């Protein structure tokens, strides 16, 4: 079975034998309901460190719900109920002894629409460290610079740190939000369609940034853009009707999918 998608080019990477990467998130038999709506069904998925894992699928398939389950943001919806286990570094995130604030320190999130605070660029990045008790100005200065450099936007903003973040372009705002996420030194970065509101040039900058960030972080990205998933991810999960249909190396999923439904989706027969 060979599937092709117009203008989708998967990464051509030489296979090098390496030691297995550690599992960051291990999802076991996860089910989730919004009231009576069974949104996630028997999800089993392992996400590895220092990789970009893409989640694709049609609207309403459960991909954003799954992403928001990884840092328990989904619990902000009062009618949510879950069964099963998600282990982060071998610890069940649903365990009552695991403070959600601690989990979200390790697992940062970048949303679909850039959402800077109505503050200066500096204060946007320093906000998280301040909340965690850091008040020394020199330390905060260092964190702000390191985070903006990590988000590949320091050179653009270093002379504008006290300007309001609302004055930035959409692409700059999104990279500022990534810098704000980096400032709390997470282990994992969740991204919910982070480029869907951006122009092509800004999208390219964010994609290049993601490739750099995976050297130090594990990244899980939800995207409707199959070309983007093919360009930037190491593994891809295809969700459909709340189920994981297929989860494998990105190159394999886009060239030789093992499930007919995957082939139908990536070749545009539905979606």
Swiss-Prot record:
Membrane topology: Peripheral membrane protein
Database matches in PROSITE patterns: ABC_TRANSPORTER_1, ABC_TRANSPORTER_2, PSTB
Keywords, comma-separated and alphabetical: ATP-binding, Cell membrane, Membrane, Nucleotide-binding, Phosphate transport, Translocase, Transport
Alphabetized Pfam families for the sequence: ABC_tran
SMART domains linked: AAA (SM00382)
Superkingdom, taxonomy of origin: Bacteria
Localisation per UniProt entry: Cell membrane
Keyword ATP-binding among record annotations: yes
The reaction(s) this protein catalyses: phosphate(out) + ATP + H2O = ADP + 2 phosphate(in) + H(+)
Binding sites annotated in the UniProt record for ATP: 57-64
An example Gene Ontology biological process: phosphate ion transmembrane transport
InterPro entries: AAA+_ATPase, ABC_transporter-like_ATP-bd, ABC_transporter-like_CS, P-loop_NTPase, PstB-like
GO CC aspect terms: plasma membrane
Main localization, broad class: membrane
Function description: Part of the ABC transporter complex PstSACB involved in phosphate import. Responsible for energy coupling to the transport system.
Quaternary data: The complex is composed of two ATP-binding proteins (PstB), two transmembrane proteins (PstC and PstA) and a solute-binding protein (PstS).
Family to which the UniProt record says this protein belongs: Belongs to the ABC transporter superfamily. Phosphate importer (TC 3.A.1.7) family.
Protein name per the record: Phosphate import ATP-binding protein PstB
Phylogenetic placement of the source organism: Bacteria, Bacillati, Bacillota, Bacilli, Bacillales
